[in-house]
From Swiss-Prot:
UniProt-listed Pfam families: PAD, PAD_M, PAD_N
Gene that encodes it: Padi2
Domain of life: Eukaryota
Main location: cytoplasm
Organism: Rattus norvegicus
Designated name of the protein: Protein-arginine deiminase type-2
Binding residues annotated for Ca(2+) 1, in chain numbering: 123, 125, 127, 131
Length: 665
């Protein structure tokens, strides 16, 4: 922010200058002196404060002009004013020059001043109101004491008949659209008119032009028009000076989320320009700057309350749908069914989208992240979710191959954690990747870069490429502990399964049958004894447990978890022709979490005393924590297609009460 400038005097002539309140004018009396001059005196209007600065020492000048000072190259004048002028050029400073012993001035130089107030203002203190001239408005800092304005990407669609998000064009069709934007006020105060040759200009840099847009409301009382003045091809806008005390209201929208090449910070400037002569560029004599940070996209972990549960209606999932509906009715959320005309045979709604939100002090709304997967559900987020106060964002790779790891069953987020004194109050994003140096599948770089650039939920890469589908939700999830600010990490465990089966075998239940009543699963009769005696299956699951333990160690380190924070759920996997794992029975960790109510894949485990021993075991682990276990039959509609309950559902949750700008990344 330019706060000091130099004005050059010329003996024998009158110089006019505009002074902006809060700045200082410097003028060199020595270089403006006529030949033979040795001393000078000063006269000035009462509205001007004049100081003679000699060798760094300042002396304030009274208005009568009797005192004289010796001319020297180290002598300058410092001028300031405290109030805006009511008339142009109404304040003046006169410098009289004298010969060494002369009593009458040999010449003089005059400076005629017009004082105005200019301030570009935003909500820099983040209280939802635009304050006046916050001294920290040009910078941006994190933390509860941080300063700096916040901008939302205007990625919802307030006008239903538009094909895309509101930020995709340069038009505003409603006041609702303006409410998504941050307010910016240009405050001016001064005489009815400025001296000739001055202009006030709003502008942005070329590098910010695709990241921010600014609108102005014309004729706010008679047939409002919303004028796009900055952004995209428009780098500057001349503001009409109206005189008196004025406030011009602008609305600012974000156009892009933070990304690999964009930190999220944008700046808007206002400059007062001075005209010199035709064909000579205007010169900036004052600049004020405001800085915004574009609000990041934030994921919501399982510990947050659910708002809506989404599930697809298929030809073969009527019973599954009914059980999910019964589960949802126990909670305070609503069930939203994606019917066949929209899902077009694609049941994997978890893989297509991830729900999150954006927030500023004045507003927030949910935003869905659309995966690069683009199955038959690809139109669902645009056609069914994007709307008023419901935003949309996507990232599509240009040259990378999209794999199963780009589906959002491979994108989860932890509850809030503190790791080695470093707080993650919004949790940490978890994505599955390939084993180091293996050259396997990995989530596409454009999505990873997007997640990293949001800054507030620092991602952790896990190892999921050992699985056929390769998603982190196949081996882990988080559950809240009702009534406490605690959670547990649930992990699939083949060793826990073998331990349970061996216990049941010792108790005399070795012939207990799995998949009882499901003749379509296999023509073979599968018992505990057969599983425990299958050496190849045992070896495979020992390898799979090593893969699980690798992830367990990463999660313990990156989330600062201890063994008491982790609950092992029995699981078995079998190796496919590519030596990757698929679930042997419905994978219970792939559950839906709705507060204390858990919708768990029904495992169809060995029947011990007419009860599934896997269900009994899991209830014994979770129900003492206050959680309610509902086992949902997904075996024919999801499990046989390599997915479970979590893969076939999606949950939009309430946002964090914690404000993201209060954290320090």
């Amino acid at each position: 922010m330019l706060r000091e400038r130099t004005v050059r005097l010329q003996y024998g002539s009158r110089v006019e200058a505009v002074y902006v309140l809060g700045t200082q004018l410097w003028t060199d009396v020595y270089s403006a002196a006529p030949a033979g001059a040795k001393t000078f005196s000063l006269k000035h209007s009462e509205g001007v404060k004049v100081e003679v600065v000699r060798d760094g020492e300042a002396e304030e000048v009274v208005t009568n002009g009797k005192q004289r000072w010796a001319l020297s190259p180290s002598t300058t004048l410092r001028l300031s004013m405290a109030q805006a002028s009511t008339e142009a050029s109404s304040d003046k400073v006169t410098v009289n020059y004298y010969e060494e012993d002369g009593s009458a001035p040999i010449d003089q130089a005059g400076l005629f001043l017009t004082a105005i107030e200019i301030s570009l203002d935003v909500d820099a203190d983040r209280d939802g109101e635009v304050e006046k001239n916050n001294p920290k408005k040009a910078s941006w800092t994190w933390g509860p004491e941080g300063q700096g304005a916040i901008l939302l990407v205007n990625c919802d669609r307030d006008t239903p008949w538009l094909p895309k998000e509101d930020c995709s064009d340069e038009k505003v069709y409603s006041k609702q659209d303006l409410q998504d934007m941050s307010q910016m006020i240009l405050r001016t105060k001064g005489p009815d008119r400025l001296p000739a040759g001055y202009e006030i200009v709003l502008y942005i840099s070329m590098s910010d032009s695709d990241k921010v847009g600014v609108f102005y409301v014309e004729n706010p009382f008679f047939g409002q028009r919303y004028i796009h003045i900055l952004g995209r091809q428009k780098l500057y806008h001349v503001v009409k000076y109206t005189g008196g005390s004025a406030e011009l209201l602008f609305f600012v929208e974000g156009l892009r989320f933070p990304d690999e090449s964009f930190s999220g910070l944008v700046s808007i400037h206002v400059s007062l320009l001075e005209y010199m002569a035709e064909d000579i560029p205007l010169t900036p004599i004052f600049t004020d700057t405001v800085t915004f940070r574009i609000a990041p996209w934030i994921m919501t972990p399982n510990i947050l309350p659910p708002v809506s549960v989404f599930v697809c209606c298929m030809k073969d999932n009527y019973l599954f749908l009914k059980e999910v509906k019964n589960l949802v009715e126990k909670t305070n959320c609503e069930l939203k069914v994606c019917f066949q005309y929209m899902n077009r045979g694609d049941r994997w709604i978890q893989d297509e989208i991830e729900f999150g939100y954006i927030e500023a002090p004045h507003k927030g709304f949910p935003v869905v992240l659309d995966s690069p997967r683009d199955g038959n559900l690809k139109d669902f987020p645009i056609k069914q979710l994007l709307g008023p106060d419901f935003g949309y964002v996507t990232r599509e790779p240009l040259f990378e191959t999209v794999t199963s790891l780009d589906s959002f069953g491979n994108l989860e987020v932890s509850p809030p954690v503190t790791v080695n004194g470093k707080a993650y109050p919004l949790g940490r994003i978890l994505i599955g990747s390939s084993f180091p140096l293996s050259g396997g599948r990995r989530m596409t770089k454009v999505v990873r870069d997007f997640l990293q650039a949001q800054q507030v939920q620092a991602p952790v890469e896990l190892y999921s490429d050992w699985l056929t589908v390769g998603h982190v939700d196949e081996f882990m999830t988080f559950v809240p502990i009702p009534g406490k600010k605690e959670f547990r990490l649930l992990m699939a465990s083949t060793s826990a399964c073998y331990q349970l089966f061996r216990e049941k075998q010792k108790e005399g239940h070795g012939e207990a049958i799995m998949f009882k009543g499901l003749g379509g699963m296999s023509s073979k009769r599968i018992t505990i004894n057969k599983i425990l005696s299958n050496e190849s299956l045992t070896q495979e699951n020992q390898y799979f447990q090593r893969c699980l333990d690798w992830n367990r160690d990463i999660l313990k380190k990156e989330l600062a978890l201890t063994e008491k924070d982790i609950i092992d759920l029995p699981a078995l996997f079998k190796m496919d022709e590519d030596r990757q794992a698929r679930a042997f029975f419905p994978n219970m960790v792939n559950m839906i979490v709705l507060d204390k109510d858990l919708g768990i894949p029904k495992p169809f485990g060995p029947q011990v005393e007419e009860e599934c021993c896997l269900e009994t075991h899991v209830r014994g682990l979770l129900e003492p924590l206050g959680l309610a276990c509902t086992f949902i039959d997904d075996i024919s509609a999801y499990h046989k297609f390599l997915g479970e309950v979590h893969c076939g559902t999606n949950v939009r949750r309430k946002p964090f009460t914690f404000k993201w700008w209060h954290m320090v990344p």
